[in-house]
């Protein structure tokens, strides 16, 4: 890397500078994805965390909103750190929080997982790397918690691993972990052994760890510990009564199902457990709820319903620690007609449902429900007449309810996670007095959307966001970005919209495509995405892919992987474009209606007959893969092409190309947005001197500026980017699990190297014995989770004299300029060749 930088300096290439862009979320609102785990601190009021499967960890605020605390650890290399498979709090220290991070245990995630720890409620994190993978987005992710801190000894932490890796223990507060050789159960259940991609063919492993705080201590550690495993054949619940020295299956335990949750009610000296016939989070057709009397060693089946009323398993389990014997359990999954919640105030002897049949198909609701912080949830998922023509009913209460918690300091405060949001409220005890509670969406601040595409039309809608699971959203102006929309893209409403585009000469004309099989997956808007209509010319066999709209809005080009590239003009029938390969990258010239562009492999294509046919264009240097094409929003014939070797530019509709710079290579999504004056900024995710991240150029790619800073966006090959077509210097980034971010700033010419957050982690060493120890490095290591990271000045400073301004170069090999910074900034080393005033 040093060699390439030296060559760049010798050749006079401009290396990116760092610009101070402050990132925040566009408020889609309401969560937008699965929340498999919620945990309250057992003693301190107001301390709680919610874990997501692809969007990281959040901390609860006093106003019921949430703050993301893992953004700073999810850069391109650490994208999998947004998969949170378990979370634990220290009962003796409300500042400490631990999490198991990693996205997949199959080949989709090449990296092993880690246990991260924070002593400041998630402001900074230290890492201990594990010698195996962690599956925050794998089957069984709603079980838990797999991570637990000994209530009698903060140094002792247990982690139940997946994939047959067993039980792990730390005795130094999470700095190192060793395998517990005395615990031999591994949780051998595999959902689908025939699954060749490994997602459903991995062992589910251990499901939870629960300490019995009422037991005595052995050597300063809690003596009784329960562990649940994914095993419905031999035994699934194990116990140690000597602080983990030996383990045995709990006698008399129920078989047949998998234990999803196990929670202790200390006042009763009882363990409550929910069971389902699958490991979740999508399955569940039978299940049960049990109470284990620890002192008596007896089990009692307290399942709320039986017979034909029992067609689901059980997942979420909340105990009221203020009121012994009071608990709430949730169905997993009652896909029809709705989820069901049950509450008991007598240790499960009797139960009260949250809804019941009046006379079919009418339901009697013992609750009210509202979503004021995310209106689209109520408008599109609750207050609708039909979810599907076959049943006419909707799922108001949610689905995939694996996390359900009652605040241990407040019997009225409860939360539960669904596949879309967090519901809950502050009057739970009304269930007992009036048999009616008020439920709200309480996920404000959680932005877990998987963004599929972004667009911003000059003079049109400020932001069009196509998302997974929740279809998409329109923000008419920049003033709307902080307010959750009233509605998702509706009529038609799909689960996922994969692509959206606008017509350059008619910016209120918008087209989108979806990936739901069996129905038309093209929708058209003539009012900038406020309302939509189905394009009935689309064949119901086609779905997914990307879409491009001609400049005048009369021609749709649709590139799919399974049906090839299709073309429709004047909303007529779609016809195959034989001159393009399936799945080709496509774009329209935004000013010339007859011109479209495409790329596949290393070949660039151009059409001058509204996409009817394409011809091969010039070779783009040594590029082997064309990844994206961005046409200039206001200049005909000007376009940029992103490739595995960098970005190429044409000003003659693709007749000739030139590479804009060699400073940025291996680029992915690119976009143009209004810059300062009459300039347009070019934004690109690619690899530069600061690594793989988001860069911007104010001079058509001649120089580049790092505008990402310490904000994590996940892997750059899955991020989306759109420059604002109307707001100078504003740029949008779509992530796979953290929604849409935006920032605004001035992008000038690059004058030096870029600053980037330094990320360090504990290294792991595995011993040859059966007890594998993971050791941290000698120096304590942390990562900032906030947008602005802490930086430490290097001891080896630059040489020279003078005073440099904010973000200016102040040192480096060969530097002869100023070495002091204007107050209050300090000169910090970014690399051997570049020091910067930050």
From Swiss-Prot:
Keyword entries, A-Z: Carbohydrate metabolism, Cellulose degradation, Glycoprotein, Glycosidase, Hydrolase, Polysaccharide degradation, Signal
Catalytic activity: Hydrolysis of (1->4)-D-glucosidic linkages in xyloglucans so as to successively remove oligosaccharides from the newly-formed chain end after endo-initiation on a polymer molecule
Gene Ontology cellular-component annotations: extracellular region
Region (Disordered): 750-801
EC number: 3.2.1.155
pH profile of the protein: Optimum pH is 5.3.
GO molecular function: cellulose binding; xyloglucan-specific exo-beta-1,4-glucanase activity
Coiled-coil segments on the chain, per record: none
Low complexity: bias regions: 754-797
All copies of domain CBM1, residue ranges: 802-838
Signal peptide (from-to): 1-19
SUPFAM superfamilies: Cellulose-binding domain, Oligoxyloglucan reducing end-specific cellobiohydrolase
GO BP: any one term: xyloglucan metabolic process
Entry annotated with the keyword Hydrolase: yes
Broad EC category: hydrolase
Annotated thermal dependence: Has a half life of 15 minutes at 60 degrees Celsius.
Active-site feature positions: 53, 469
Glycan-linked positions: 232, 436
Job description of the protein: Hydrolyzes the glucosidic bonds of unbranched Glc residues in tamarind seed xyloglucan, producing XXXG, XLXG, XXLG and XLLG. Has a low activity against beta-glucan and carboxymethylcellulose. Not active against Avicel, laminarin, xylan, galactomannan, linear and branched arabinans, galactan, polygalacturonic acid, starch, beta-D-Glcp, beta-D-cellobiose, beta-D-Galp, beta-D-Xylp, alpha-D-Xylp, alpha-L-Araf and alpha-L-Arap.
Family: Belongs to the glycosyl hydrolase 74 family.
Protein name stated in the entry: Xyloglucanase
Origin species: Hypocrea jecorina (strain QM6a) (Trichoderma reesei)
Origin organism lineage: Eukaryota, Fungi, Dikarya, Ascomycota, Pezizomycotina
